[in-house]
């Protein structure tokens, strides 16, 4: 009934109450505090958000809606009306519950985020404030005695008023424990899920002069639940005073912005990192054979200046680009606390030729390698010619062998023997040493008429050093003065005991000229090879040694190779010393081309990129890249060794050379036909010098004389020596134009004699003193315009005008000079002999007395010789 009356109430235009405009915002004044005690009153206002109250949670409204629906919908039965009413009520309740649940979840999420941010900011602000307060307290403690009382007094009311500040609004997390917790009205109990949310009052910062009834009026019978507010400390609450700093009141501290806190935190972190030593990282530093200081510093991640300081402490004065050895670098790395690992550039040679030992099942017999050694002109090459039925000795310049040759001979029984012929001249010691190193048996050729000679003894030493057996061939048995017994007896002095004297050394009396007992020599060699049981594996990569190397026009660099293991084929890639190449052709000792070379077979190999050195190892590798790496490493190693040899000496040595005078040098450019001759020439010429003059080899190589050789000789004013080679037309024309001397030779001792004569001509001549006579002073005369003249008697020898004289007084030399005048009876004479009187005067000297003795002598110039 009540609802019906409300709907039927008469309408009226008169308002029920007085119209008024409510305030949309609350205003107030706050005082802002700044640094240095400044403050300012500002006007602020807080606007309240307008929210429309939800009707979903009001039970009365729901009932009215249901009744209204029942009034207008008269076509439904009471049961249907009750069911619809229940459905509407349930839907409204579910919607309210869902909305409330979402709202609570959103509020809880925001509360957690705000709480976390607030706690973080408060913690940072508290820590920074404590640090600032402590610093300020320490600073203020020293000035407290000087601070006027009136400056400290105003701070007391401010500190005292701090506890009267209004308490902060409660957070969404619930009531905070405090003195006003019990005074909260009971209306703040949790609302039911169906209750509509009420807008909470906004927190308003009011002036201290505002009246308290204003706050009370805002509270109603049912005070609304306060809206959650972000609890953040105000950025500026007041300036820091001495009293507040000493009491440690946190409320008097002035807050800082988040950005300022972040910057301060980063600054403190950087300061702590600078003050605390950083944790050192231990690195593994790879150290090669040589390394410069900058590279070492980079690998350790250290400054180059620190590395140089460490080197200076170790006594090594080095620059940033100077190279140091591996041992010094390892000490530096250990000084910095890092770990070092030594590596070497020679690692590229690892595994080169170091194959596994060949099994006995793959080994086959091979011919013996025999080296013929002995003194010069004892018939080594003639003996080989007789066995090969050739005439090599007839083509040798000067009748001596100056090359090392390798040949293979087939005996009557069909067996093969490889012979290596070595020079016997003293200059070819290196060749003989190479021959003994690669050989299996040494045939020592001794002339029956000469016996044991110096190079024979040297050959015996090479054979003993190589630990190879010796077969003695006593040659020239066709001569009438041959004495083989003397040879056998002389061999005993060098620990070679032949079979005739109870030893185990085989010896054969032969004659190369008449081909006497050559078959017995072959039998002795084969017997010795059977005892040695020489075998090799032919089915593997080839290994050998360079016997000789040369440069031929149209063929390039050619080397004679003695194969020791494996089989060498055309197309193989190889490394020989510092050079590499690919086999283009193989030529045997008869000049025939072959496709393969088996063990103990000497062949000429074409295809070198450069000329190798005699005695270098010859090894076949798997590919071209490996060959290039090994070749580049060995060339770099040779260059470094050359730089070490030509490096400047110490400062003391330089001063010694300046004081003693630099030794005169004869620059020489040597070009020869084969590498062995180059070595022999260099060794022979370098032995010719002495302390006054010496040979300086500018360049020594294999091949013809070209323009670059002439240019090099011109730059040093040197001499060019061509041994069995000639200069090309362009080089000859350039040498003629520039005045460069080119000497051609084919015999090595002729080169030595000529160079020795040149060095002798560079020596300073020596002077020899020759005594010629004595004269005694009998009287002294004073002659006007002449001075004092001595009247003398020649007591011994003769006296010559212009000769050197010494004036002796009491057997002490008081003057040394020369005669200016020599007269006899007023006539100038050239000489006065013993027993005659004469008059003499000295050049620029007049202190002569009666009784003095004049010694007369001459200086003879003597040419110096080496």
From Swiss-Prot:
It comes from the Bacteria. Residues 475-478 are annotated as: G4. One of its GO terms (molecular function) is guanosine tetraphosphate binding. One of its GO terms (cellular component) is cytosol. InterPro entries: EF-G-like_DII (IPR053905), EFTu-like_2 (IPR004161), IF2_assoc_dom_bac (IPR013575), IF2_II (IPR044145), IF2_N (IPR006847), P-loop_NTPase (IPR027417), Small_GTP-bd (IPR005225), T_Tr_GTP-bd_dom (IPR000795). It is found in: Cytoplasm. Residues 152-164, 179-197 have a biased composition (Low complexity). Coiled coil: none annotated. Residues 92-135 have a biased composition (Basic and acidic residues). GTP binds at residues 374-381, 421-425, 475-478. Residues 26-36 have a biased composition (Polar residues). Keywords: Cytoplasm, GTP-binding, Initiation factor, Nucleotide-binding, Protein biosynthesis. Residues 421-424 are annotated as: G3. Residues 374-381 are annotated as: G1. This is Translation initiation factor IF-2. The gene is infB.
């Amino acid at each position: 009934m009540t609802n019906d009356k409300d709907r039927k109430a008469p309408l009226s235009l008169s308002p029920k109450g007085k119209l008024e405009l409510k305030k949309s915002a609350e205003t107030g004044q706050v005082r802002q505090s700044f640094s240095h005690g400044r403050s300012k009153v500002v006007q602020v206002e807080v606007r309240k958000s307008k929210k429309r109250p939800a009707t979903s949670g009001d039970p009365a409204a729901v009932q009215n809606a249901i009744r209204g629906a029942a009034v207008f919908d008269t076509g439904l039965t009471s049961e249907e009306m009750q069911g619809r009413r229940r459905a509407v009520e349930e839907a409204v309740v579910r919607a309210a519950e869902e909305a409330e649940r979402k709202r609570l979840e959103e509020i809880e999420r925001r509360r957690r985020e705000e709480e976390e941010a607030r706690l973080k900011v408060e913690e940072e602000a508290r820590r920074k404030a404590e640090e600032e307060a402590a610093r300020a307290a320490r600073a203020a403690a020293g000035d407290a005695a000087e601070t006027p009382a009136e400056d400290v007094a105003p701070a007391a009311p401010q500190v005292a008023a701090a506890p009267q500040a209004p308490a902060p609004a409660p957070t969404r997390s619930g009531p905070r424990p405090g003195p006003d917790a019990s005074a909260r009205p009971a209306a703040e109990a949790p609302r039911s899920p169906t209750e509509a949310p009420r807008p909470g009052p906004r927190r308003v910062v009011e002036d201290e002069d505002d009246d308290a009834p204003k706050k009370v009026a805002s509270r109603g019978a049912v005070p609304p639940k306060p809206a959650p507010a972000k609890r953040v400390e105000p950025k500026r609450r007041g300036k820091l005073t001495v009293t507040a700093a000493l009491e440690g009141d946190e409320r008097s501290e002035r807050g800082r912005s988040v950005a300022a806190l972040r910057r301060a935190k980063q600054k403190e972190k950087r300061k702590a990192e600078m003050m605390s030593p950083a944790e050192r990282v231990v690195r593994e530093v790879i150290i090669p054979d040589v390394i410069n200081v900058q590279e070492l510093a980079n690998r350790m991640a250290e400054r180059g200046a620190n590395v140089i300081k460490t080197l200076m402490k170790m006594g090594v004065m080095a620059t940033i680009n100077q190279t140091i050895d591996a041992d010094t670098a390892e000490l530096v790395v250990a000084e910095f606390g890092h770990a070092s690992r030594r590596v070497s550039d020679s690692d590229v040679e690892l595994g080169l030729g170091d194959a596994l030992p060949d099994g006995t099942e793959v080994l086959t017999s091979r011919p013996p390698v025999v080296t013929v050694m002995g003194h010069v002109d004892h018939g080594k090459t003639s003996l080989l010619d007789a066995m090969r039925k050739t005439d090599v000795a007839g083509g040798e310049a000067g009748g001596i062998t100056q090359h090392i040759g390798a040949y293979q001979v087939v005996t009557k029984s069909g067996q093969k023997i490889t012979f290596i012929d070595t020079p016997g001249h003293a200059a070819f010691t290196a060749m003989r040493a190479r021959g003994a190193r690669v050989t299996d048996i040494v045939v020592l050729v001794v002339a029956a008429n000469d016996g044991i000679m110096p190079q024979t003894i040297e050959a015996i030493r090479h054979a003993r050093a190589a630990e190879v057996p010796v077969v003695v061939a006593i040659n020239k048995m066709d001569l009438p003065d041959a004495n083989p017994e003397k040879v056998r007896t002389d061999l005993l002095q060098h620990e070679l005991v032949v079979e005739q004297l109870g030893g185990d050394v085989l010896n054969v009396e032969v004659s190369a000229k008449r081909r006497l007992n050559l078959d017995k020599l072959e039998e002795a060699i084969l017997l010795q090879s059977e005892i040695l049981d020489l075998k090799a594996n032919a089915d593997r990569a080839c290994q050998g040694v360079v016997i000789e190397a040369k440069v031929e026009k149209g063929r390039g660099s050619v080397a004679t190779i003695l194969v020791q293991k494996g089989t060498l084929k055309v197309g193989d890639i190889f490394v020989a010393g510092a050079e590499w190449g690919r086999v283009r052709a193989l030529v045997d000792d008869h000049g025939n081309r072959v496709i393969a070379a088996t063990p103990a077979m000497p062949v000429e190999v074409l295809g070198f990129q450069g000329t190798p050195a005699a005695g270098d190892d010859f090894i076949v590798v798997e590919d071209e890249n490996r060959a290039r790496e090994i070749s580049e490493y060995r060339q770099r190693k040779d260059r470094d060794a050359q730089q070490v040899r030509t490096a400047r000496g110490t400062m003391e040595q330089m001063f010694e050379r300046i004081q003693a005078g630099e030794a005169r040098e004869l620059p020489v450019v040597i070009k020869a036909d084969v590498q062995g001759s180059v070595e022999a020439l260099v060794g022979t010429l370098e032995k010719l010098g002495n302390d006054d003059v010496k040979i300086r080899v500018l360049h020594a190589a294999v091949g013809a004389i070209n323009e670059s050789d002439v240019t090099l000789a011109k730059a040093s004013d040197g001499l060019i020596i061509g041994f069995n080679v000639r200069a090309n037309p362009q080089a000859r024309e350039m040498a003629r134009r520039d005045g460069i001397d080119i000497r051609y030779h084919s015999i090595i001792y002729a080169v030595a004699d000529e160079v020795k004569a040149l060095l002798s001509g560079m020596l300073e001549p020596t002077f020899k003193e020759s005594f010629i006579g004595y004269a005694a002073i009998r009287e002294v005369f004073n002659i006007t315009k002449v001075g004092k003249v001595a009247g003398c008697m020649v007591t011994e020898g003769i006296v010559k005008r212009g000769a050197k004289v010494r004036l002796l007084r009491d057997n002490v030399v008081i003057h040394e000079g020369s005669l200016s005048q020599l007269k006899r009876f007023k006539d100038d004479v050239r000489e006065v002999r013993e027993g005659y009187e004469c008059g003499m005067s000295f050049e620029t000297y007049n202190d002569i007395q009666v009784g003095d003795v004049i010694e007369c002598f001459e200086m003879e110039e003597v040419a110096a010789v080496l």
